[in-house]
Amino acid sequence: MNNELLECPCCKNRTLSELGAYEVCPICHWEDDPVQSNEPDYAGGANQNSLNQAREAWEQSQ
């Protein structure tokens, strides 16, 4: 069993135990929605903003 954490699609920190399982990143608070991972411009679903919008906001906050 591999216990290595996986990269958050938003902030790129290794915080997720499984991709697409709707886990919330404890660093950037992105909820890993598989629909938004496949369609990064889609706003709605588990997150109000699209993945691309959230990535941009995260980068600007750093």
What kind of region is each of these model predictions?
Residues E23-V24, L51:
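Intrinsically disordered, low-complexity regions enriched in Ser/Pro/Gly/Gln/His and often acidic
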Residues L5, Y22:
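Residues immediately within or flanking Cys/His clusters that coordinate Zn2+
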Residues S17-E18, D33-V35:
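Short, non-ligating residues that shape and space the ligands of small metal-coordination modules
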